[in-house]
Amino acid sequence: VDHSVNEHFSSYSGYLQQVFGARTYKVTVSSGLTCPTRDGTLGKKACAFCDLRGSSSYFGKQGRGKSITDQLNQRLPEIRKRFASQKFLAYFQSYTNTYTDDSSYLEEIYEAALSHPEISGLCIGTRPDCLTDETLELLERLARRKYLSLELGVQSFEDATLQWLERGHDGQCSIDAMKRLRERAPSVHVCAHLIFGSPTDSPESPEIAARLLNSSGVKGVKLHQLMVLEHTELARRWKEEAQFPVLSLEEYTGQVARFLEHLDPKIYIERLFALSSHRDELIAPKWSSERWEPHNFMRQWFADRGIRQGSRFS
């Protein structure tokens, strides 16, 4: 593994550089789909941490419902101007982008993105309980043609935490989904999302998660700290019931370090922590509104302690 870009962990930018041979950036598009925790199937108030936007970033908030091509044409000029990228991936980010019984609709929106002359591949955010056999077949078919990354919302492997987060699935569901992806859609690059810092997490949850991912076949991991945002169930609990503990930057960094040390060095890290893109809606932890302070703190903390991804991997 090439740690040259980063001495502590395998970076996503390095991984994309290897895949595409160029700087690559994601362009957010909306699929118009919802989630089983929003439409009444598993509940109506969404996962406890998720706000009205369905976990989207700033760039994803304009243009929902327009055709995929229109959305890409609208966003690409601004992104080209802001980021010196040569390659672009269409990123179906918000809500659950495989959640429909109509697989022809999925094929239509994915193909629309892939047929755009400037798009080199797809990133699709989804849940482990929203992958039918038909969807896996479609994903594999597309992934044999073009780069396709599936961002899988695992969040935790611990059932107590998944219940506390009101995810509507258990840890085994994620393990099973990763196995089915490995067997039925081996060309898909799976990236698992994890949240550290729920008060229900066991002390050894970072190591447990790393070990489960090591044997899962995933290519990457995206890490988030637990954040309390306005317009979420967590915010309601925080205000109406009791303030639960959230991790300080140092505590979170310690958990990430333990996770990294047990993680296979071949698995790339797409993100070390999440940035709250709407500062005015962040309740806690306050460090989540800063981009560079946590980044620099974590790098320094790792350097001071000689933290390296995979140092305890066996």
Write out the residue ranges for each language-model feature.
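A contiguous, low-structure linker/loop signature
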Residues: 75-116, 121
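Auxiliary Fe-S-binding modules of radical SAM enzymes
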Residues: 2-14, 23-24, 220, 227-314
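Structural recognition of alpha->loop->beta junctions
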Residues: 47, 110-119, 208-222, 293-308
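A structural motif corresponding to the C-terminal end of an alpha-helix
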Residues: 116-119, 180-190, 216, 254-268
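N-terminal [4Fe-4S]-dependent radical SAM core
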Residues: 1-89
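Hydrophobic faces of well-ordered beta-strands that scaffold small-molecule active sites
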Residues: 25-29, 88-90, 122-124, 148-152, ...
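Conserved non-cysteine loop/helix-boundary elements of the Radical SAM core domain that shape
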Residues: 57-66, 94-107, 122-185, 196-216, ...
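Short loop/turn motifs at secondary-structure junctions
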Residues: 46, 86-88, 118-120, 146, ...
